[in-house]
C-alpha cells in the first residue's frame, strides 16, 4: 500500500520536482538491456542540455538514439559521438557488419549533429577536445579493470558540469565488475543508481550542477524523497516498454491478418485456374471448329458479297486459334506466364516474314562478342547454352568462352569440339582458376566485337536476342548499354518468374541490380573502365555496370522490353551458386559505396537493404533547410488534428513551418482549435483562404506565402509512421537532378495506398501495388526499394521551391482537384528532373477523409474535364511509362501480365 502511495505522489509532483517533461523513444530494440532506461535517458538530455555527448559502447544503438532523439526534439546545440568497433566482445557477443549498417541507417536522420566513430575507446580520445564532454555513457567491456580504465582515460575530456552514466551496475555474474567500480565512485561523488534492468548508475562528476538537474540533485540529500526519482523513472520505463510491446503485437496481428487474406485470395485464384483448365480443351475445340467454318464461308465459291465476306473474316479473326485462350484469361483478371509464352510463340510465327526482313536489313551490323566464363557446368547445359547462341537469327556474332580450369574433362571436350566445328566459337583455357571476374576478363581479351554481351555458362538466349539488340544499335548508334527483360528456366525446361523491367531507372539500380541479364555493353567502354575487378566476386556484374554508367549519358542506356534471356535457376547453376555466397551481398554494397564516392566526391555510406542483394544509400542532408509543410483543409477537425499532432509530435526533422490553409471552415470547434494551435506552437500558421475549393490554387497561394527552401505538400488526412520521414524526403530532394519526392502511404488497415504512380494505369494514372499488404515486397521487391517514377502523389510530396516555381506550380485553371499532382510531376520530369519514390518515408493516409468523393453530377463533370485535359496534354492513354513495362497490364494495379503483344517495335527506347 505504501508503494502505491509513493507512485501516486510521484506522479502528482513530477513537474515540481523534476522540472522537465518525459518523452518516449521512437526507436525500439527488443534486444536492448537499456529499454526501461530510455525515458530517463531522454529526460537527462533535456535537463542537462549538454554541449557534447559521448557514448562508449553503442552496439545496436538504443541508448545512443534516445540521446539523439532528445537532442533533435529539443533543437539543442549538442554534438553526439558514438564510439564502438561494432565487432562485439565476450559480454555482448561477436557479430558481423549488419549491426553497424543498421546503426548507420538509423543515424542518418541525426547526421547534422551525430557522428559514429568506428574506433577503440582509446583511439577516439584524439577526436574529442579536453573538458568538453557534458554527458559520458560508459557501456563497453564490463570487467572491473576494463570499465575502470575506460572511465579514467576519459576523465580529462569531462567538463566541470559533467554527468557520467554506467550501465550494468547490478550484474554480478559472468565476471562483470561494473558494480564493484561503481561502489567506489558512488562513495566519493553524488550519485543515483537505478537498480532495474541490469542497473544504471548516474554520477555527478563535475563540481557544477546544471540548472535542469538541480531538483534531482536536491533529492539525493533528502531521505524523504530519495526514492522518488527511481520510482518515477521505473514507472516511465515500464510504461514505455508496455506501449512499445503492444504496438509490436498489434503490428504482428495486422500482418498475420493481411497474410491470411492474401492466402485466401491466392486460393481463389488457384481454384479459378483449375476450373479454367478443365474447360479449356472444349473451348479450344469449339473455337477451332467455328473458326474453320467462318474462314471457309469467307472464301466460299462462288464469292460472297464483299461486305458479307468481310464480316465472316472479322468473326473468324476473333476466333483464330492463334489467339488461343489468351484474351479470355486476361479478361478474367489474370494471365499465366505459360499462356503468355505460348502466345508469343504464335505471334512470332505470324511475324516470321517481318523478322526475316529485319535480319536481312541488319546483316551487316556490328559484330557482337558473347562472353562466357566457364567452370564445371553440367555438360548438357553447356551444350544448350552454346546451341542457343548458334541458333541466333542474327549471324554476325562470336562466342568467346574462357574455361577457368574446369575439373570435369567432359567440359573441355565439349568446348574443343565446338571450336573445331564453328569458327565463331573461340575458346581460351586458363592455366589457373581465377573465379568469375578473371575468367570473364580472359574471354573479353579475345573478343573482337564492337559490343560485348554477357552470358552465364548454363543460361539461354532467345533466338532473336541479338537481332533485336542490333536493331536498337542501328536506331541509336551511340548506344553504350542495352538490357532486356529476362525469365528463369527450371529443371524440365519450364520457364517462369519473368522479370519485366522498367526503362533506365537510376534510383532503382542504386537499390538492386535490376538490369542483370541480358546486358550488352559497348566494348570500348568495357575496356575503358577496366572490365571486371577482382575482389567483387558475386557482384562483379553490378560493379562493372556502376563503373560504366559513370561514363555514359542516360540517353545512351536502352531497354528492350522483351524476355530475351533465360536464367538457369536449378541447384548448382552458375547463377544459383554465385548468389548463394554471402560475401556477394557485401561486395555489391561496397561497389555502390565506391561508385557514389567517385560520382559525388563525398563519402556516402551504403547499408544492406531489406532483402538479399539490395542496398540503401544514406544520402546526407545539406544543412537543415527550412521546410514549408502545406496542408489545405476545411473543418473535419478530428482528421486534421490527428495529422498536425502526428507531424509536430513524431517528426524528427526540426526545421519546418506548418502552414494550415483554412478553406472556409465554419465549425466552432475547428475555428477554436486554429487559435489554440497557432498560440501553442510557433511553427504553426493558419492562412485563411475562403475561395471555392480549388486544391491547386490553395497550395499555390500558400507556397507563395511560405518561407521554406523546401516545400512539402501534405494532405490533411495523413499520420506519421516513420519519425524520419521528412529527413529522408528532404535528403533526396536536395540531390542534384531530383524533382518530386514521394512517400510510402498506407491505408489505416495497413494495406498500400501509394507506392508510386504509373501513367496510363486505368486510362490516366493509377497507383501501382494498390491494396498490397503493407509488408509485401511487391513486384520484384519494388515496394522495398527507392526508385524513379514518372509521378508520385501530393498526399505527401516534397520538392525544392525553386523547381516548384520554375514549372509554374500546380495547374489551377484546368486541374482544380484531380491530377494536379500528376501534372506537376510530369512538368518536373519534362524539365529534366527525376521524380523519386522512397519506402523509408512512411505515413498513413485516410484518403479523401475530409474532401469526400466524386459523388455529385457537378463533381463528376469536373472530373471528366480533368481526365480529358490529361489525355490531351500528356497523351496518358498512349503514354509508355518508363517506370512500368508494356508487358504488364494497364487495367489493374498489381503488376500482372498483359495479353501477349510480341511485335517488332518501331518505337525503340
Swiss-Prot record:
Tagged with keyword Cell membrane: no
Gene Ontology annotations of biological process type: single-species biofilm formation
Keyword Signal appears in the UniProt entry: no
SUPFAM superfamilies per record: Nucleotide-diphospho-sugar transferases, S-adenosyl-L-methionine-dependent methyltransferases
Keywords for this protein: Plasmid
Classification via InterPro entries: Glyco_trans_2-like (IPR001173), Glycosyltransf_2 (IPR050834), Nucleotide-diphossugar_trans (IPR029044), SAM-dependent_MTases_sf (IPR029063)
Pfam families reported in the protein's UniProt record: Glycos_transf_2, Methyltransf_24
UniProt xrefs under PANTHER family: GLYCOSYLTRANSFERASE, GLYCOSYLTRANSFERASE 2-LIKE DOMAIN-CONTAINING PROTEIN
Identification of the protein by name: Uncharacterized protein y4gI
UniProt organism field: Sinorhizobium fredii (strain NBRC 101917 / NGR234)
Upper lineage: Bacteria, Pseudomonadati, Pseudomonadota, Alphaproteobacteria, Hyphomicrobiales
Amino acid at each position: 500500500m505504501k508503494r502505491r502511495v509513493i507512485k501516486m505522489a510521484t506522479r502528482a509532483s513530477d513537474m515540481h520536482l523534476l522540472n522537465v517533461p518525459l518523452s518516449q523513444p521512437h526507436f525500439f530494440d527488443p534486444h536492448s538491456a537499456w529499454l526501461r532506461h530510455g525515458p530517463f535517458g531522454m529526460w537527462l538530455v533535456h535537463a542537462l542540455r549538454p554541449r557534447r555527448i559521448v557514448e562508449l559502447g553503442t552496439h545496436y544503438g538504443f541508448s545512443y538514439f534516445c540521446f539523439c532523439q532528445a537532442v533533435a526534439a529539443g533543437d539543442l546545440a549538442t554534438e553526439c559521438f558514438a564510439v564502438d568497433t561494432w565487432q562485439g566482445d565476450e559480454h555482448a557477443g561477436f557479430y558481423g557488419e549488419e549491426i553497424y549498417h543498421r546503426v548507420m541507417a538509423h543515424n542518418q536522420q541525426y547526421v547534422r549533429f551525430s557522428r559514429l566513430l568506428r574506433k577503440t575507446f582509446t583511439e577516439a580520445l584524439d577526436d574529442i577536445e579536453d573538458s568538453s564532454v557534458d554527458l559520458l555513457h560508459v557501456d563497453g567491456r564490463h570487467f572491473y579493470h576494463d570499465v575502470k580504465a575506460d572511465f579514467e582515460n576519459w576523465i580529462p575530456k569531462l567538463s566541470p558540469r559533467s554527468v557520467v552514466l554506467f550501465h550494468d551496475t547490478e550484474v554480478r555474474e559472468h565476471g562483470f565488475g561494473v558494480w564493484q567500480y561503481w561502489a567506489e565512485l558512488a562513495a566519493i561523488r553524488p550519485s543515483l543508481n537505478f537498480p532495474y534492468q541490469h542497473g544504471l548508475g548516474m554520477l555527478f562528476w563535475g563540481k557544477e550542477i546544471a540548472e535542469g538537474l538541480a531538483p534531482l540533485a536536491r533529492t539525493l540529500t533528502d531521505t524523504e524523497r530519495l526514492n522518488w526519482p527511481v520510482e518515477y523513472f521505473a514507472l516511465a520505463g515500464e510504461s514505455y516498454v508496455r506501449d512499445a510491446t503492444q504496438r509490436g503485437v498489434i503490428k504482428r496481428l495486422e500482418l498475420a491478418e493481411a497474410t491470411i487474406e492474401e492466402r485466401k485470395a491466392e486460393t481463389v485464384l488457384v481454384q479459378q485456374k483449375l476450373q479454367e483448365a478443365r474447360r479449356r480443351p472444349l473451348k479450344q475445340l469449339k473455337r477451332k471448329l467455328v473458326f474453320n467454318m467462318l474462314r471457309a464461308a469467307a472464301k466460299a465459291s462462288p464469292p460472297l458479297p464483299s461486305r458479307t465476306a468481310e464480316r465472316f473474316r472479322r468473326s473468324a479473326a476473333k476466333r483464330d486459334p492463334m489467339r488461343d485462350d489468351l484474351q479470355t484469361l486476361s479478361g478474367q483478371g489474370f494471365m499465366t506466364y505459360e499462356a503468355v509464352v505460348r502466345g508469343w510463340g504464335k505471334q512470332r510465327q505470324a511475324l516470321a516474314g517481318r523478322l526475316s526482313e529485319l535480319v536481312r536489313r541488319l546483316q551487316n551490323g556490328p559484330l557482337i562478342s558473347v562472353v562466357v566464363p566457364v567452370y564445371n557446368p553440367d555438360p548438357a547445359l553447356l551444350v544448350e547454352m552454346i546451341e542457343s547462341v548458334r541458333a541466333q537469327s542474327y549471324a554476325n556474332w562470336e562466342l568467346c568462352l574462357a574455361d577457368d580450369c574446369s575439373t570435369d574433362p567432359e567440359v573441355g571436350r565439349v568446348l574443343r569440339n565446338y571450336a573445331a566445328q564453328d569458327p565463331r566459337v573461340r575458346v581460351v583455357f586458363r592455366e589457373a582458376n581465377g573465379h568469375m571476374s578473371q575468367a570473364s576478363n580472359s574471354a573479353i581479351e579475345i573478343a573482337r566485337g564492337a559490343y560485348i554481351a554477357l552470358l552465364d555458362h548454363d543460361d539461354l538466349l532467345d533466338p532473336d536476342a541479338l537481332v533485336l539488340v542490333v536493331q536498337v544499335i542501328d536506331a541509336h548508334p551511340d548506344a553504350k548499354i542495352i538490357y532486356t527483360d529476362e525469365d528463369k528456366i527450371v529443371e524440365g525446361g519450364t520457364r517462369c518468374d519473368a522479370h519485366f523491367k522498367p526503362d533506365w531507372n537510376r534510383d532503382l539500380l542504386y537499390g538492386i541490380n535490376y538490369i542483370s541479364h541480358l546486358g550488352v555493353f559497348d566494348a570500348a567502354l568495357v575496356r575503358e573502365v577496366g572490365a571486371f575487378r577482382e575482389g567483387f566476386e558475386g557482384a562483379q556484374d553490378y560493379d562493372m555496370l556502376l563503373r560504366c554508367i559513370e561514363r555514359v549519358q542516360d540517353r545512351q542506356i536502352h531497354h528492350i522490353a522483351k524476355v530475351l534471356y533465360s536464367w538457369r535457376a536449378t541447384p548448382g547453376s552458375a547463377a544459383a551458386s554465385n548468389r548463394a555466397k554471402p560475401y556477394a551481398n557485401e561486395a555489391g554494397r561496397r561497389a555502390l559505396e565506391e561508385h557514389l564516392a567517385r560520382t559525388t566526391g563525398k563519402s556516402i555510406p551504403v547499408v544492406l537493404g531489406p532483402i538479399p542483394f539490395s542496398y540503401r544509400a544514406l544520402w546526407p542532408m545539406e544543412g537543415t533547410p527550412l521546410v514549408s509543410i502545406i496542408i489545405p483543409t476545411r473543418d473535419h477537425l478530428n482528421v486534421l488534428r490527428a495529422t498536425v499532432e502526428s507531424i509536430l509530435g513524431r517528426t524528427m526533422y526540426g526545421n519546418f513551418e506548418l502552414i494550415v490553409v483554412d478553406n472556409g471552415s465554419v465549425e466552432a470547434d475547428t475555428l477554436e482549435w486554429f487559435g489554440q494551435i497557432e498560440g501553442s506552437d510557433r511553427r504553426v500558421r493558419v492562412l485563411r483562404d475562403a475561395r471555392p475549393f480549388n486544391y491547386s490554387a490553395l497550395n499555390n497561394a500558400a507556397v507563395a506565402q511560405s518561407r521554406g527552401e523546401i516545400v512539402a505538400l501534405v494532405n490533411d488526412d495523413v499520420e506519421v509512421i516513420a519519425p524520419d520521414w521528412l529527413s529522408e524526403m528532404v535528403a533526396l530532394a536536395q540531390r542534384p537532378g531530383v524533382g518530386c519526392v514521394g512517400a510510402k502511404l498506407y491505408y489505416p488497415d495497413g494495406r498500400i495506398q501509394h507506392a508510386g504512380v504509373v501513367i496510363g494505369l486505368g486510362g490516366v494514372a493509377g497507383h501501382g501495388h494498390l491494396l498490397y499488404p503493407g509488408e509485401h515486397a511487391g513486384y520484384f521487391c519494388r515496394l522495398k526499394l527507392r526508385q524513379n517514377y514518372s509521378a508520385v502523389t501530393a498526399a505527401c510530396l516534397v520538392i525544392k521551391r525553386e523547381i516548384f516555381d520554375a514549372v509554374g506550380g500546380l495547374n489551377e485553371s484546368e486541374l482544380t482537384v484531380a491530377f494536379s499532382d500528376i501534372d506537376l510531376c510530369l512538368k518536373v520530369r519534362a524539365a529534366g528532373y527525376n521524380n523519386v519514390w522512397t519506402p523509408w518515408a512512411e505515413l498513413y493516409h485516410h484518403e479523401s477523409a475530409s474532401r469526400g468523393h466524386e459523388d455529385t453530377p457537378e463533381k463528376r463533370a469536373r472530373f471528366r474535364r480533368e481526365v480529358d485535359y490529361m489525355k490531351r496534354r500528356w497523351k496518358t492513354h498512349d503514354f509508355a511509362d518508363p517506370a512500368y513495362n508494356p508487358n504488364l497490364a494497364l487495367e489493374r494495379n498489381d503488376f500482372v501480365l498483359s495479353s501477349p503483344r510480341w511485335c517488332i517495335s518501331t518505337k525503340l527506347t
